[in-house]
């Protein structure tokens, strides 16, 4: 499980809020958060950079989430996570994990959220120009200042995570508690040619998480709709034309996995999307899928995945480990 400096344990499914308050208006955003909380959810994920790609969107996610938390008086009842250290969108080669950059991002995030601390602070990207010691020291200091309770990494390689863990242990500093990366039942390769890639679960990374039981917080856990209603109808018709959703995931292996997911779902009387999420919850290490939606019904559907107990035979049929 995630080890937090808190008595609150995060719910197994996390709510992502990337375009809340921007493309997803305030009313719809609040309705989704209400439904998530009503279903037992308490783990919220946002980021300093979110919606910077939209006109007047930068900061809207953190502000909208913060307003909802204050309105409902829930700050001490939830796990609040945000991310910083993301490169400028027009200069993705630029590392931003220096002490002054993290200080700036964190301060602005706390101000937008209207809180004194966050439970988890993720570094949105690595900064290979910085030693892991410098990064570990920076985040450890913010924990000592009670501005964050724990920290994690997002889109880091296993090698750099191992280096940070070893450094923190060696010098009695605070280690990262989890890795946030792309992970769903559908495989997707990391674009290693990208200057600062979004990293996706692969067989080697999966093996490391299995060996160490290091927790994974999984973005794109629903593969941008690849296991949704539209794609299931498309699969039942024999895959005519392009995939209605999740086209970046489409391929022979994922189509086979989609068909098996549909079969398991039909046998159980649940949805393929619920089965796909349940697979992540049945891994040999802790996985906390992040869901992202603007529809209340999708939140309720996703949260029910926690009640599905898959058998070893079903997991084998689904080939639920990343591509070998």
Task: Describe these PLM feature segments.
Residues 110-131:
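Active-site groove signature of glycoside hydrolases
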Residues 50-54, 87-93, 187-192, 298-301:
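A short acidic, helix-capping loop that chelates divalent metal ions and anchors anionic groups
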Residues 24-31, 56-60, 64, 93-101, ...:
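Alpha-helix N-cap and loop-to-helix initiation/capping positions
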Residues 1-77, 144, 223:
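N-terminal binding-site loop/beta-alpha segment at the start of enzyme catalytic domains
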Residues 8-13, 40-42, 74-78, 115-119, ...:
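Short, well-ordered coil/turn segments that N-cap beta-strands
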Residues 24-36, 97-113, 162-166:
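Short, acidic/polar
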Residues 4-23, 81-94, 117, 122:
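N-terminal small/glycine-rich loop or linker at the start of catalytic domains
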Residues 126, 130-323:
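Beta/alpha (TIM)-barrel catalytic core signal, keyed to glycine-rich beta->alpha loops juxtaposed to Asp/Glu
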